[in-house]
Amino acid sequence: MSKKLLIKTWGCQMNEYDSSKMADLLNAANGYELTEIPEEADVLLLNTCSIREKAQEKVFHQLGRWKTLKDKKPGVVIGVGGCVATQEGDSIRDRAPYVDVIFGPQTLHRLPEMIKQSQTSDAPVMDISFPEIEKFDRLPEPRAEGPTAFVSIMEGCSKYCTYCVVPYTRGEEVSRPMDDVLFEIAQLAEQGVREVNLLGQNVNAYRGATHDGGICSFAELLRLVATIDGIDRIRFTTSHPLEFTDDIIAVYEDTPELVSFLHLPVQSGSDRILTMMKRPHTAIEYKSIIRKLRKARPDIQISSDFIVGFPGETDKDFQDTMKLIRDVDFDMSFSFIFSPRPGTPAADYPCDLSEEVKKERLYELQQQINSQAMRYSRLMLGTEQRILVEGPSKKDLMELRGRTENNRVVNFEGSPDLIGQFVDVKIVDVFPNSLRGELLRTEQEMNLRIATSPSEMKAKTRREDELGVATFTP
């Protein structure tokens, strides 16, 4: 009987990616199979996020529930990973001594040996260090789970925004070598992946080493990924306005695989608040980037992050944010009330705003974004859209579900063999959270670009023999 693994994931797409790698790693090393039933699990892993308020208490609340399972089944291994583990490792060890393994985002590759070690140790096994980007060298080959996939291209952030814990929990920016990224994507393409989402806390700061000792920029990486046959759609998240340079914008002019949708967090429309956040750009500079993007790709749609109620935010500061939202005409946003994160400079800033005012501002902001998003959706009525078919519709299992470039879900009637392919549909109805389409043509009738086969890309990748001597086929 196979051993069972349950992974509970909170937080960003990087955490989702890390959790998938944990599952692959433990399956390859020890034969663990995933389960969603806690009572079945031999190993319970909690992959945590420390961005939001009360993240630590949320962790201890979940661990308390798992302790009940461990009391009934003493052999169960409980592990805590992610950013809360990095920040609060000692606290977890003290407050929850029944936790067996504590690991950080950069040490998840050590999970098999840490779990094994914990089974012969009375004390929790903990490693929350930052060993550069070693974890990517220790992970098994990627396994595709559908036509879309996340691929991490870098880790950490070196910007040190005053409200953010990422530099303290994931370390500073470290880029994966270019060959490693391309090899992973080629492996996924061979398994039927059609869309990749390149991940990092600040992907446009990517500077990956090349086989000949050079450096590959993010713009160059995007163009290389686009040449891999089968990869017909590229997304990336998240970006920083400071390094959204003209060479990246130029990729939107000549690389159709790069989607007409961009998540570019601005956080506030007030220059005063941006300075307090240590965001080294102004609202006007942000709008200048958007103007250049829309010149390169007129149909591009923009989403952002916003923090409402930052310490010292006045009504004028908030109205400056609302003006930026209207001027840029954002399509969607992730918006939150400021919550102080322990150890960050902003946690010590005085704040005299009432919770009521913060909630009112958040509601006003979200209503504005929602109205803009609905207007964009209505403008799509009657248009032709190319969608990647992801699987059965969640509303009707007899129908299919796909996604447009601008992240709209489209439900339509079609045969199951279309799953994993691109189709063109006509949008015939608009709903708050989805669109309805009618099938116009399938992939066989399209002229999708073919450049480099996945096997060719893999053959070009840097290799080391048993002596560690590297070779590269140009």
From Swiss-Prot:
Its EC number is 2.8.4.3. InterPro entries: Elp3/MiaA/NifB-like_rSAM (IPR006638), Methylthiotransferase (IPR005839), Methylthiotransferase_CS (IPR020612), Methylthiotransferase_N (IPR013848), Methylthiotransferase_N_sf (IPR038135), MiaB_methiolase (IPR006463), rSAM (IPR007197), rSAM_horseshoe (IPR023404). One of its GO terms (molecular function) is N6-isopentenyladenosine methylthiotransferase activity. [4Fe-4S] cluster 2 binds at residues 157, 161, 164. [4Fe-4S] cluster 1 binds at residues 12, 49, 83. Pfam families: Radical_SAM, TRAM, UPF0004. The keyword Phosphoprotein does not apply. It comes from the Bacteria. Residues 378-441 form the TRAM domain. SUPFAM superfamilies: Radical SAM enzymes (SSF102114). This is tRNA-2-methylthio-N(6)-dimethylallyladenosine synthase.
